[in-house]
């Protein structure tokens, strides 16, 4: 068995085997030059999930990421019948790989390409001497958050404690940002990003 899969849950390993058997392949691109396909997939995922406008990073954001951090970026693609059906955008530095953004085309969700993205990422990380992969959390603070639970399947033996500071340093500016976003009382912090 693949040694990196020791971290993966049993159901995760099964999904990876099934996806590979169905014909999904993958490609890891170091220092990517063109991320247009990734952007199409990412934005379609945000549409499907009815994401907040906050998550619709504009093209200039990605252009700046590539301009300043290209040598520390990998783009991971899941490929099925010569089509890119899912992709992940990652940063790495000092032996830590950080998941940033990812997406899957709706019509291929049944093939579970997101599992292949994580599998390919873990293989690349191991081959390149990474000590940790940080996938981030979910879309809420709940321990039952579906995205968080999905990511947890890939880290059976490793879990990081994670804290977010919730201090408001400038109440006036904070309140103005909340007002601009028409935000009411919420448990989400910072409220203007909800």
For the regions a language model picked out, list residue spans one by one.
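Alpha-helix boundary/capping detector
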Residues: 64-68, 125, 151, 176-178
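Repeat-unit-sized solenoid/scaffold elements
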Residues: 67, 111, 120, 158-167
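A conserved beta-strand-loop-helix scaffold within acyl/acetyltransferase catalytic domains
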Residues: 1-110, 123
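Secondary-structure boundary/capping signal
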Residues: 50, 73, 129, 158-159
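A broadly tuned preference for mixed-charge, low-complexity surface segments
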Residues: 16-22, 76, 83-89, 127-149, ...
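Active-site/acyl-donor-binding loops of N-acyltransferases
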Residues: 1-3, 131-194
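Acyl-donor binding region in acyl/amide transferases
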Residues: 94-156
